Amino acid sequence: MKIMVLGAGTMGAGIVQTAAQAGFEVVVRDIKQEFVDRGIAGIDKLLSKNVDKGRMTAEDKAAVMGRISGTVDMGAAADCDLVIEAALEVMDIKKAIFKELDSICKPECILASNTSALSVTEIAAATGRADKVIGMHFFNPVPAMKLVEVIRGASTSQATYDAIKDLSVKMGKSPVEINEAPGFVVNRLLIPMLNEGMYCLMEGVANAADIDTSMKFGAGHPMGPLALADMIGLDICLKIMETLYKEFGDPKYRPCPLLAKMVRANKLGRKTGEGFFAY
């Protein structure tokens, strides 16, 4: 099986690395060559660390990197068996990508989206192969996180679901079957909890460090909600909350004003060096 991953950012590169380590030939595509090069260089750096720590041999690393190629040409999807989209979490962007892929890819090619909250059914409507469109939601950092949410759209076929479930297992993941709903399972439960932590901070209930300490030692969480939001990216948290609020129309999903304020200030968490904590 040949796989294309669209997007060489953190999630895309993680998917590329995981697929290549599982033995698949992978091509990563992004809109600029510098993005592609940066993504592949990041994979190389992470694998080098694994070699240094004795987790893999130099020969194994070379074999993995040999299965990875990069391009800016969307036409490279023509001979792929699966395309996994890991682009921006914006519906119009995803629909445009899937419409283009539908015109390029061979009829039997499966088109998967790594969307964290958007409708697979709506994305699939941009194509003429809705039965072969599916959600394949990985979690960051992809090489380490075992879960993949496999999301059925309204028209996703059983054959498509079975193929992606089997692939997820071959990639060393534990797939869970999701019938499409806003936020799926993890983000529907997780992101509102993070959002509530932000309300606690905004309302002066406790400071950021104490909020996180409370959830780590009081609820057994490995990471506090505000540090976790910083790791996910506050812009991503905001988009997910906006999606939940829009789809459900329930005030409990209203994004915290402090979250929106921080995103406007480009304080997005770890990736910008500052969020609820400094990095």
UniProtKB/Swiss-Prot annotation:
InterPro entries: 3-OHacyl-CoA_DH (IPR022694), 3-OHacyl-CoA_DH_CS (IPR006180), 3-OHacyl-CoA_DH_NAD-bd (IPR006176), 3HC_DH_C (IPR006108), 6-PGluconate_DH-like_C_sf (IPR008927), 6PGD_dom2 (IPR013328), NAD(P)-bd_dom_sf (IPR036291). Keywords: Cytoplasm, Fatty acid metabolism, Lipid metabolism, NAD, Oxidoreductase. The keyword NADP does not apply. Gene3D superfamilies: N-(1-d-carboxylethyl)-l-norvaline Dehydrogenase, domain 2, NAD(P)-binding Rossmann-like Domain. Its main location: cytoplasm. GO terms for biological process: butyrate metabolic process; fatty acid beta-oxidation. This is 3-hydroxybutyryl-CoA dehydrogenase. It comes from Syntrophomonas wolfei subsp. wolfei (strain DSM 2245B / Goettingen).
